[in-house]
């Protein structure tokens, strides 16, 4: 893990050195419909710094995500949370649900400062965010609520499979995870995304017509286009498709 972490940190700089040594001025590329080469500008120092910083936090997040559960397990905190959940709940599935909520709340508080540094502070330091601290906290608390609800409703399933089939519970859990993932793909744009963004009709009707025509040409009939004032949060995203 440490090797991978160090590799992630230093690989952007190594890549930048190779890039800058191999490309004297600008890269060129062509596409099928281009009449000539298209110049690709060399990444700026700021872009390379952002890339390196983002990868640092990505690697740190992997290690942190392993460290925190291990800390709960080996310090006995997990057992204490279990005891509290058992006092509050009678049935085993309620105990698991309550444990999930308590664990999620504690880890949320532990992770919040890290999230502030790796997300809110970093994006603002590179001038890529318009998000206020209030909106950032609001989004995090919404994510917390969703995590608590999902954990309470569904975490008991793998434990039930573990009780019924100690040898193959992991296989059955994996099989059940497939339809669950597809369900979440359908649910997210309808009920979860609107919790973070305000969707409305597209103001530029001419652009909407072009987008719908392109979708129909691609075999996607009956599409709808919505507009979100995402510039309130970020300067990086201008559109996405779901």
Label the model's feature ranges.
Residues 3-4, 14:
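Cleavable N-terminal signal peptides
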Residues 17-74, 79-242:
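Polar-ligand-bearing catalytic/cofactor-coordination segments
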């Amino acid at each position: 893990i440490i090797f991978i972490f160090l590799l992630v940190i230093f690989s952007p700089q190594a890549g930048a050195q190779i890039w800058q040594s191999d490309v004297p001025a600008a890269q060129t590329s062509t596409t099928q419909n281009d009449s000539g080469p298209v110049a690709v500008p060399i990444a700026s120092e700021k872009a390379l710094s952002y890339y390196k910083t983002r990868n640092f936090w990505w690697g740190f997040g992997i290690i942190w995500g392993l460290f925190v559960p291990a800390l709960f397990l080996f310090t006995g905190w997990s057992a204490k949370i279990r005891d509290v959940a058992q006092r509050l709940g009678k049935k085993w599935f309620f105990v698991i649900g309550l444990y999930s909520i308590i664990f999620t709340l504690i880890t949320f508080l532990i992770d919040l400062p890290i999230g502030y540094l790796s997300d809110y502070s970093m994006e603002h330091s590179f001038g890529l965010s318009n998000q206020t601290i209030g909106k950032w906290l609001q989004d995090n608390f919404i994510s917390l609520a969703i995590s608590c609800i999902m954990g309470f409703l569904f975490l008991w399933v793998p434990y039930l499979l573990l009780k019924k089939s100690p040898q193959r519970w992991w296989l059955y859990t994996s099989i059940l995870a497939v339809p669950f993932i597809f369900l979440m793909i359908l649910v997210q744009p309808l009920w979860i995304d609107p919790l973070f963004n305000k969707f409305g009709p597209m103001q530029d009707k001419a652009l909407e017509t072009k987008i719908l025509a392109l979708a129909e040409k691609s075999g996607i009939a009956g599409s709808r286009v919505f507009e979100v004032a995402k510039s309130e949060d970020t300067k990086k995203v201008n559109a996405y498709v779901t």
